[in-house]
């Protein structure tokens, strides 16, 4: 689960955006600049990332759900892959407005998606060619839009976002509902309102892979710890069972 400073350096986490695009609120996390590019201070980024991992691990240990969000071209595949590995919901194509604030409607779409998949498995022979084509198109669209959250029965307990500026609607919805946010914040965005800020490059595929893998590892660690604790508790209960002593046996 642990990420090192060297790994962050190799992934280019320290490369911010051009100095002219900077957000002054990121000043505490900026080390300096080189060739008109801001350099993010990894001595700040590393402990803050570890803090975010700690939170994700604790949440997972308490059976909480973290929604992973990364819809930028270079993040899509990486986020989907790590979310699937960790067994958590994800959004990798586009954020639909109201995905959280209007979750009731989203749940209707999830039900429609599941019904259509069941219908497809049963066979579409009774449909005409045209109906089958329209059915396939609708299914494909639903799968693309909400496929990653089809097993999310309720609102998530936290959201992990790569690039808070690009996903400002997701961030705004989470804030409105009081859902804790873990966010990768580059030098051109504001860290305000993000509960667990990870100052770092939000464009490099290597950096994105490092964040997504790190959070997925933390979730899996938290779950594994929870299972171990339950096993220990069950074993302890078993050893404490009341044994009746036959006084006449002496």
UniProtKB/Swiss-Prot annotation:
Pfam families, alphabetized: Ribosomal_S2
InterPro entries associated with the record: Ribosomal_uS2, Ribosomal_uS2_bac/mit/plastid, Ribosomal_uS2_CS, Ribosomal_uS2_flav_dom_sf
NCBIfam families (alphabetical): rpsB_bact
Name by which UniProt lists this protein: Small ribosomal subunit protein uS2
GO molecular function per UniProt: structural constituent of ribosome
GO cellular component annotations of the record: cytosolic small ribosomal subunit
Gene3D superfamilies documented for this protein: Glucose-6-phosphate isomerase like protein, domain 1, Helix hairpin bin
An annotated GO BP: translation
Gene name of the record: rpsB
Keywords: Ribonucleoprotein, Ribosomal protein
Family that this chain belongs to: Belongs to the universal ribosomal protein uS2 family.
């Amino acid at each position: 689960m642990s990420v090192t400073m060297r790994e962050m350096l190799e992934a280019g986490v320290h490369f911010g955006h051009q100095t002219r695009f900077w957000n002054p609120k990121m000043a505490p996390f900026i080390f300096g600049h080189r060739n008109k590019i801001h350099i993010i201070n990894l001595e700040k980024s590393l402990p803050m990332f570890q803090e975010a991992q700690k939170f994700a691990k604790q949440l997972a240990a308490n059976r909480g759900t973290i929604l992973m969000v990364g819809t930028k071209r270079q993040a899509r595949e990486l986020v989907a892959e790590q979310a699937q590995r960790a067994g958590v919901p994800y959004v990798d194509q586009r954020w639909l407005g109201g995905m959280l604030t209007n979750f009731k409607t989203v749940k209707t779409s999830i039900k429609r998606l599941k019904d259509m998949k069941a219908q497809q498995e049963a066979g579409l022979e009774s449909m005409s060619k045209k109906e089958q084509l329209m059915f396939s198109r609708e299914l494909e669209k639903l799968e693309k839009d909400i496929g990653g959250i089809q097993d999310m029965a309720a609102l998530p307990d936290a959201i992990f976002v790569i690039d808070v500026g690009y996903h400002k609607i997701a961030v705004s919805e989470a804030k409105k509902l009081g859902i804790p946010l873990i966010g990768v914040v580059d030098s051109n965005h504001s860290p305000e309102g993000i509960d667990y800020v990870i100052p770092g490059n939000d464009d490099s595929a290597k950096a994105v892979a490092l964040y997504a893998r790190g959070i997925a590892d933390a979730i899996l660690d938290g779950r594994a710890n929870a299972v171990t604790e339950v096993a220990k508790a069950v074993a302890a209960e078993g050893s404490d069972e009341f044994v009746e002593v036959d006084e006449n046996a002496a």
